[in-house]
Amino acid sequence: MAKQSMKAREVKRVALADKFFAKRAELKAIISDVNATDEDRWNAVLKLQTLPRDSSPSRQRNRCRQTGRPHGFLRKFGLSRIKVREAAMRGEIPGLKKASW
C-alpha cells in the first residue's frame, strides 16, 4: 500500500490540473502562436511559470485505485498488475482468463 500522503498528493495534483487547465491552455496557445509579438509570447511564458508547478498534467502519476501503487499500472483496468492478477484469478474481470497453450 502506498502512503496516504502520496495518495493525497496525487489527488491534489489532479484538482490543481483541473482548476488551471483553461488558463494553462490559453497561455500555451499564445506561446505557440507565430503571429503573436515576441513581447506577448514572453509575457505568456512568464505567466505560465507563475502557475503552480503541480497544475501541470505531466506531474500526475497513474496509481492503482486499490493500493495506490505507482508502478505496474494497467490503464485499461485502473489497477496495478498485482491487483489485476488477483481479480482475474477470482473471476471478477469478465472475459479475462489465464493464458494456457
Curated annotation (Swiss-Prot):
Q: Which UniProt keywords apply?
A: Ribonucleoprotein, Ribosomal protein, RNA-binding, rRNA-binding
As for family, the record states: Belongs to the universal ribosomal protein uS14 family.
Q: Which GO terms describe its biological process?
A: translation
Subunit relationships = Part of the 30S ribosomal subunit. Contacts proteins S3 and S10.
One GO cellular-component annotation of the UniProt record comes to: small ribosomal subunit
PROSITE patterns of this UniProt entry? Answer: RIBOSOMAL_S14 (PS00527)
Per its UniProt record, what HAMAP family does this chain match?
Ribosomal_uS14_1
- Keyword Ribosomal protein carried by entry: yes
Q: Which GO terms describe its molecular function?
A: rRNA binding; structural constituent of ribosome
Query: Which gene codes for it?
Result: rpsN
| NCBIfam families xref list | PRK08881.1
Protein name, UniProt field = Small ribosomal subunit protein uS14
Extract the SUPFAM superfamilies matched here. Glucocorticoid receptor-like (DNA-binding domain) (SSF57716)
Q: Which InterPro entries match?
A: Ribosomal_uS14 (IPR001209), Ribosomal_uS14_bac/plastid (IPR023036), Ribosomal_uS14_CS (IPR018271)
Question: What is the documented function of this protein?
Answer: Binds 16S rRNA, required for the assembly of 30S particles and may also be responsible for determining the conformation of the 16S rRNA at the A site.
Query: Which superkingdom?
Result: Bacteria
